[in-house]
Amino acid sequence: MNRTAILPPKKAVDTAVTTRICDLWGCLHTKKDLLKLVNVALEGLYGERACSVSMAQLNKTAYSSHNPDRYYTFKIPKKKKGEFRTIDAPEPTLKYIQQGLNLVLQTVYTPHSAAMGFVPRRSVVTGARMHLGQRLVYNIDLKDFFHTITSGRLYSRLTSKPFCLDGKVAGIITDICCYSGPDGRNVLPMGAPTSPTITNIICERMDTKLTRLAKAYGLKYSRYADDITFSGMANVFGEDSRFIKSLRNIIEREEGFTINPDKTRLCHRGMRQEVTGVTVNEKENVPRWYVGQLRTMLHNWEMDGHDKAQAVFECHYVPKFTRPSSGLPPIHHIENVIAGKLLYLKMVKGETDTTYKALNRRFAALMDSLKKRATLIK
């Protein structure tokens, strides 16, 4: 199972599998039912590569949420230079089970229309598109988002409508999806496959309230994980305004999250307005530095060759950190990073955009040369 968990699942799951998941969900009453459901989901994700989860493995996974060996911790850089985000990644067997469970949750639950993250056919671009051409864009960030969602909160949600799960089944799912956090509380780990989907489940009530609040003030509202955006033509965002007071009351007093004041910003039309990293002043765009970074990476590769470009990339772009619990350093290949950046550029600007097409042509030529070199070496 460990080897299978490292391999990527299929990009698309057959409709027959999702239909089967919905049917089994309607008959979910016992741990045995849950095991069958997870295995059906894993078959849908991995096909012939799937390894069935045994009852013993499910029990071991479910009843060891306080075991520190279930997760290993590493850091990834934030956009702000010198700052890092801590990721708690599950060990392979736990990750494998969580992947199956995540497909189940995504199949049986439809997130609120304002939730743009971790939902099929929604993205940072669809979220940003809502706020195009507005006079004002107001962004806020929820502090320590994943660790604010406790196991008790998840259990309560799973035993309530629309899930209405048996208490024992809800408890097993909660144990699989939560871990003992830095302060000893059982919370959502940032790094588990199930965590993003669960945040949308937990935030549904808040999304409903904030959508209603936005409508009352003639605003548009969207949320991508912990990033919340309002936009509109009227400035109702004064520090002591009725809107801001209502907003804080909903988020902090009623829903138990905390607004991060350091990441709260109001952008006027004359400024660069961004929603989850996408510029929305007139049309969706990426920041200039993003394209500049791509051009620099491609230029270094074209002028100095792949190996020297890789060395420069590791020196200037790859943070000096390792995964302490596993002893394995993260692997960063410049060609993979460029490919990912180009995919994002394509998603935001479109495949017919001249900037994207020019950069993609340069990358394709470099990749052809790299493949030819590899063939000659063989």
Question: Residue ranges of each PLM-predicted region?
Answer:
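Catalytic palm active-site di-aspartate
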Residues: 139-143, 191, 195, 217-234
